[in-house]
């Protein structure tokens, strides 16, 4: 049976991950730890014999720079890359820039958990005159006003990620090309929910660690057979737990 592999990588720790702030579409860069995580992901992939024909990422530099570091370790810096806003992190609306623990102290752990992980729950909206509104950013100049979010739930994130998967990424895989995607916690959760047919309750508890390669294997009909992280299982579990705890009051 022919098996096709897909590799997903959540960007390495960003400066705002380090500061425990809601990031969303804010274009913050990797921390020093995040750069190390991205390089380590590339080394792991090289050790496991992975190489790629095409890469996808978002238009946010924490994902782009993660991909750069991964491909550099693979000696594949030349690889063609498509960047799309449809792989961006979920837009956190008016929460962007706020400290997660302080927000939990103000609104309660459960409210913040719902904002972070609830399926159809949207954080408070931005206004269009807010400097954080993506309509002020030249990289989104070609998007219609309808496409520019004031806030997003995971459900709304799925509405942009999955058509991009079905229309753009999957056809490339079906043509025989080996693909890697470097993206974000919630854009990858959107894809994982779809691939694994997860319920809304199941996705609430899913936390994807930073900078760890997640491998999906597909059968000849491009149905997922299995998935697994590369690396030390205990370290990966600890990193996922740390992601879950970011939204709790101190």
Swiss-Prot record:
UniProt feature coiled coil, ranges: none
Pfam families associated with the record: His_Phos_1 (PF00300)
Gene3D superfamilies assigned: Phosphoglycerate mutase-like (3.40.50.1240)
GO aspect biological process, one term: gluconeogenesis
InterPro entries listed in its UniProt record: His_Pase_superF_clade-1, His_PPase_superfam, PG/BPGM_mutase_AS, Phosphogly_mut1
Residues of the site described as Transition state stabilizer: 184
Assigned keywords, A-Z: Gluconeogenesis, Glycolysis, Isomerase
Pathway this chain belongs to: Carbohydrate degradation; glycolysis; pyruvate from D-glyceraldehyde 3-phosphate: step 3/5
Residues that bind substrate: 10-17, 23-24, 62, 89-92, 100, 116-117, 185-186
EC number of this enzyme: 5.4.2.11
Keyword match Nucleus: no
UniProt keyword Isomerase, yes or no: yes
Molecular function GO labels: phosphoglycerate mutase activity
Reaction(s) the record says it catalyses: (2R)-2-phosphoglycerate = (2R)-3-phosphoglycerate
Catalytic residues in the record: 11 (tele-phosphohistidine intermediate), 89 (proton donor/acceptor)
Quaternary data: Homodimer.
Stated role: Catalyzes the interconversion of 2-phosphoglycerate and 3-phosphoglycerate.
Similarity-based family: Belongs to the phosphoglycerate mutase family. BPG-dependent PGAM subfamily.
Record's protein name: 2,3-bisphosphoglycerate-dependent phosphoglycerate mutase
Recorded name of the encoding gene: gpmA
């Amino acid at each position: 049976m022919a098996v096709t592999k897909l590799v997903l990588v959540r960007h390495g720790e960003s400066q705002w991950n380090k500061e425990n702030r809601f990031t969303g579409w804010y274009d913050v860069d990797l921390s020093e730890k995040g750069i190390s995580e991205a390089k380590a992901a590339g080394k792991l992939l090289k050790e496991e014999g992975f190489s790629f024909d095409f890469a996808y990422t978002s238009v946010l530099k924490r994902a782009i720079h993660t991909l750069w570091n991964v491909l550099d370790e693979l000696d594949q810096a030349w690889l063609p890359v498509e960047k799309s806003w449809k792989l961006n992190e979920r837009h956190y609306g008016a929460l962007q820039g706020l400290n997660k623990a302080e927000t939990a102290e103000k609104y309660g752990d459960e409210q913040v958990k719902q904002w972070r992980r609830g399926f159809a729950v949207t954080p408070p909206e931005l206004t269009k005159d807010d400097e954080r509104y993506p309509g002020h950013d030249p990289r989104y100049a070609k998007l219609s006003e309808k496409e520019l979010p004031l806030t997003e739930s995971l459900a709304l994130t799925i509405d942009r990620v999955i058509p991009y998967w079905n229309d753009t990424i999957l056809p490339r895989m079906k043509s025989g090309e080996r693909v890697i995607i470097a993206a974000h916690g919630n854009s990858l959760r959107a894809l994982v929910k779809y691939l694994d047919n997860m319920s809304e309750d199941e996705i609430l508890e899913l936390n994807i660690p930073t900078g760890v390669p997640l491998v999906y294997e597909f059968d000849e009909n491009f149905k997922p057979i299995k998935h697994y992280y590369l690396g030390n299982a205990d370290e990966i579990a600890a990193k996922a737990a740390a992601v879950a705890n970011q939204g709790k009051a101190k």
